[in-house]
Amino acid sequence: MARYIGPKAKLSRREGTDLFLKSARRSIADKSKFDTKPGQHGRTSGQRTSDFGLQLREKQKVKRMYGVLEKQFRRYFEAADKKKGNTGANLLSLLESRLDNVVYRMGFGSTRSEARQLVSHKAITVNGQSVNIPSYMVKVGDVVAVREKSKKQARIVEALQLAGQVGFPAWVEVSADKAEGTFKKSPDRDEFGADINESLIVELYSR
């Protein structure tokens, strides 16, 4: 299955929530469209979705939010299920530890897609070493930085300025001037307010 390259706002509208696929500079008018499905004019009550449909839709939403395809997403779930603690929370913690997501959380990219490009184009280092694998798992204490020759890229400068206005998550410590940050700890479930019901995903894979 190929990665989706179509209009990103369409995916958010399909899921009925902001998947954070576009910059935070999106207008309020754009965000108000999320409760209208693609191709749908005005609000309709529609038919009641089955439990399986709800579970499947939640999985699709999270996959799209983090830019992960099915095979890899399944591996994350299996790894989360083997760890101690809540499987759903473990799954989200693993997704949050991906390098492309950490780059996004540190504000080097304004979206996860942009952060993934920065990683793939070798603009990012981990502990001083270039890493170009978006799925690389960042560990507690790792220092993630923008390579020196990439620090003046307009999109990185703008993304950091925007992130500075919005604020950084508690689990990363960022030096905007140096364009580097430290992954302080794995985030607790209640530390990021994403509109996710991970229990539905656990139920789906437990069928």
Curated annotation (Swiss-Prot):
SMART domains: Ribosomal_S4, S4. Gene3D superfamilies: Ribosomal Protein S4 Delta 41, Chain A, domain 1 (1.10.1050.10), RNA-binding S4 domain (3.10.290.10). Residues 42-52 have a biased composition (Polar residues). GO terms for biological process: ribosomal small subunit biogenesis; translation. One of its GO terms (cellular component) is small ribosomal subunit. GO terms for molecular function: rRNA binding; structural constituent of ribosome. Part of the 30S ribosomal subunit. Contacts protein S5. The interaction surface between S4 and S5 is involved in control of translational fidelity. This is Small ribosomal subunit protein uS4.
